[in-house]
Amino acid sequence: AYSTAGWLGLTDQQIIDTIDEMKKNGFDCFKMKVGLNIKEDKKRLKFIRSHIGEDAKLMLDANQIWGVNEAIAHMKELTEFNPIWIEEPTARDDVEGHLKIKNALKKYDIGVATGEQVPSPVIFKQLLTTGAIDFCQIDATRLGGVNDVIAVILMAKKYNIPVCPHGGGIGLCNMIIHYAIWDQISVAKTQKNQYVEYLDFLQDEVFKSKLKVKDGHYIAPESHGWGLEINKDFMNNHIYPTGSVWIERENSGNILFKG
């Protein structure tokens, strides 16, 4: 599994604290957001790489902020930090653009990952059949349900592209672990390059069944179904407009309710 340490907006110390907490759980794969400013990206990547060590895996994520040529130019500036992939380097449905980026970065051993914003198996088919991506990042809720997810996983197997599910959303990690277990045992039949995203702060206190990791890997869940039964306290605190979360926002002046 891997997790994001280098969120935009965090201070250097907050990033270091996040990395240290991840290391306690055995993580050796870390992701950082990039794209707004090349000088700032280099500065943050330098201390992140030094803190995680040269042997740790580093992923970069641009969240579709670049055009194709801009993505290539920006990533060439970051090759010294040895990232294993650049995630969402350009628009989600620009298949030709992803292929151009992939071909340009191949000599630097930087892969292209995308898929968390792709809503259709047809777009995944185009990305896979053209060889435009190195890592297939399905989103369990962006696609149209279990059948669509299964279709994409099977297509990825046909083209020998590892599936690395997106987990950046409340409940997503609870769902993708089931797909990952099935894929790694029965479809891909390997864990090689099958990086599954893990974000604990999007799960804590929300669900009765908490996800667990050990030595940087998910522990198979024991709860029934997806494991998405919500804690009553969390639900009550977030009920609109009577929950404590909304009342606090109203009292702070950040949001006003009209009777």
Regions found by a protein language model. Give the residues of each.
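Metal-dependent enolase-superfamily TIM-barrel catalytic cores that perform enediolate-based chemistry
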Residues: 1-104
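Pocket-edge structural micro-motifs
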Residues: 3-5, 215, 222, 232
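Basic, gly/Ser/Thr/Pro-rich low-complexity segments located predominantly at protein N termini
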Residues: 11, 40, 136, 221, ...
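Shared catalytic-loop signature of beta/alpha-barrel
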Residues: 82, 93-225
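Extended hydrophobic packing segments that form well-structured cores
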Residues: 226-259
